[in-house]
Amino acid sequence: MYAVFISGGKQYRVVKNQIIRLEKLNSPLGTTIEFDKILMLFDKDSIKIGTPFVEGGTIKAHIQNHGRLKKIKIIKFNRRKHYKKQQGHRQYFTDVKIIDINSIKGEV
């Protein structure tokens, strides 16, 4: 069984007990959060596709870790003009473990 949901403007496909890396969430470590913007629920017997979201469907997850990724460098330059601009960026992330996937009737 798996589900597809939206978090931080991106779509993620998850199964139970999977650890995924999401965009930064403003919740403390060790808390349980619930995602309700579920696009699709899939079980070996049935598929539920939302319009746009599956009503009553939730995904419960446990926050494992907060952090930052490696620095990426952005370099912009013009040739023959002696112009160069450098910038770096480190993206924040949150690691989450999927605890449970529920539909409106209970488990899918």
UniProtKB/Swiss-Prot annotation:
It comes from the Bacteria. SUPFAM superfamilies: L21p-like. Signal peptide: none annotated. The keyword RNA-binding applies. Keywords: Ribonucleoprotein, Ribosomal protein, RNA-binding, rRNA-binding. GO terms for molecular function: rRNA binding; structural constituent of ribosome. GO terms for cellular component: cytoplasm; ribonucleoprotein complex; ribosome. This protein binds to 23S rRNA in the presence of protein L20. Belongs to the bacterial ribosomal protein bL21 family. This is Large ribosomal subunit protein bL21. It comes from Buchnera aphidicola subsp. Acyrthosiphon pisum (strain APS). The gene is rplU.
